[in-house]
């Protein structure tokens, strides 16, 4: 068991849990659900963890990639970063950054017929040497339920981009154009405060929300921000109506220099429990650990009257109300 995090019970009261819910180095998490079980992998692609409730996680002991797939991925890049798992049709797809440098990195596709893999190598989706986009990393793949179009959002120091994929999600669509969606290039913003990475898209009440992380992932400058658009191919704007591609985004979650939990970012998925409460996963540093590890946290996400998401106090919580699943 990675973490047994429930801390309080009461007659008729909702249980609480302690953060981090994954108390080990687990950066850039992606989480998916199938038949009542949650699965997660993270940067490094070491193993698959499973959970019944997003709080209690167990190491399955299963490698996410087959031996052949891992060898082919290693040939593409020394480092495996920021996986993204999504179901397309009857296949489970895994998208992974294979990284050597900001000018030599790409996004590669893998597939499996079961949610826990093993995922087999399919091939390259896009690469910095093909597009000239520095840091072709941090894939986010999704299918628009209104049109059926499959999209890839990605990027970091070369700014965030989107491009259409073919219906199988295994190649860039014929004639597709790479479009700048969010953030500035690091050459124009060396502090990285408006350089965005870790894209995640979420649909709610007729809006598409684009969650991003800005700052330096290794320190307290890292923050989660958000903007929204009516369509996946439209302009994403912050709460004031300013364009995300001009470097604007509404602050969602941050830390202060003295905080025990600092540098929250690169959020994973949002899940809604049986009570209708939304929860988001993200990684964060824990000063009390005495390490530079990035642990995975879980926290309730709320929505205001104008449809904008927010966290309680805008800070990382040491404990929160536990979600309810599968009872």
Identify the residue ranges that each predicted region occupies.
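Bacterial N-terminal signal peptides
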Residues: 1-8
């Amino acid at each position: 068991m990675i973490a047994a995090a429930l801390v309080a019970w009461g007659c008729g009261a909702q249980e609480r849990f302690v953060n981090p819910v994954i108390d080990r180095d687990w950066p850039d998490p992606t989480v998916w659900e199938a038949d009542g079980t949650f699965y997660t992998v993270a940067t490094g692609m070491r193993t698959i963890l499973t959970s019944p409730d997003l709080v209690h996680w167990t190491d399955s002991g299963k490698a996410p990639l087959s031996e052949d797939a891992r060898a082919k991925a290693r040939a593409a890049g020394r480092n495996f970063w920021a996986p993204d798992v999504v179901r397309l049709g009857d296949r489970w797809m895994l998208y992974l950054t294979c990284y050597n440098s900001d000018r030599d990195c790409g996004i590669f596709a893998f597939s499996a017929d079961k949610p826990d893999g093993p995922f087999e190598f399919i091939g390259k989706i896009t690469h910095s040497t093909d597009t000239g986009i520095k840091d072709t990393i941090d894939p986010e793949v999704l299918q628009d339920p209104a049109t059926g179009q499959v999209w890839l959002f990605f990027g970091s120091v070369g700014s965030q981009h989107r491009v259409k994929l073919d219906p199988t999600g295994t190649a860039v669509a014929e004639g597709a154009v790479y479009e700048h969606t969010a953030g500035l290039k690091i050459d124009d913003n060396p502090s990285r405060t408006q350089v965005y990475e870790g894209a995640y898209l979420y649909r709610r009440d007729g809006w598409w929300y684009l969650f991003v992380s800005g700052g330096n992932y290794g320190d307290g400058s890292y923050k989660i921000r958000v903007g929204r658009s009516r369509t996946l191919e439209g302009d994403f704007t912050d709460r004031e109506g300013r364009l995300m591609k001009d470097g604007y985004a509404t602050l969602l979650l941050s830390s202060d220099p003295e905080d025990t939990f600092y540098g929250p970012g690169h959020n994973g998925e949002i899940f809604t429990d049986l009570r209708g409460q939304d929860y988001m996963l993200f990684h964060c540093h824990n000063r009390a650990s005495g390490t530079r590890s990035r642990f995975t946290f879980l926290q309730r996400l709320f929505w205001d009257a104008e449809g904008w998401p927010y966290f309680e106090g805008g800070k990382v919580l040491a404990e929160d109300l536990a979600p309810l699943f599968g009872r």
